């Protein structure tokens, strides 16, 4: 399980990071970068469901690992 710092090392450039906690587990998981899938990344014991970035803002959506 990767940590957030490991994930950010894969992302080139300077980013402001926003972690958005989802109230419900999303229906679909998937996506990734450089062979790393979002569901394989942990943010403080939470699982990442989606990562998007716009204008150097990295938005990380997470939900609790039940």
What are these regions (language model features)?
Residues 2-24:
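N-terminal acidic leader/helix
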Residues 19-66:
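Detector for the mature cores of small, proteolytically processed
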């Amino acid at each position: 399980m990767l940590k957030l710092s490991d994930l950010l090392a894969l992302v080139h450039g300077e980013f402001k990071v926003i972690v958005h906690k989802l109230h419900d587990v999303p229906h679909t998981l998937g996506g990734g970068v450089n062979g790393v899938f979002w569901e394989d990344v942990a943010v403080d014991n939470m699982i990442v469901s989606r990562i998007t970035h716009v204008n150097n803002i990295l938005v990380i959506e997470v939900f609790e690992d039940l």
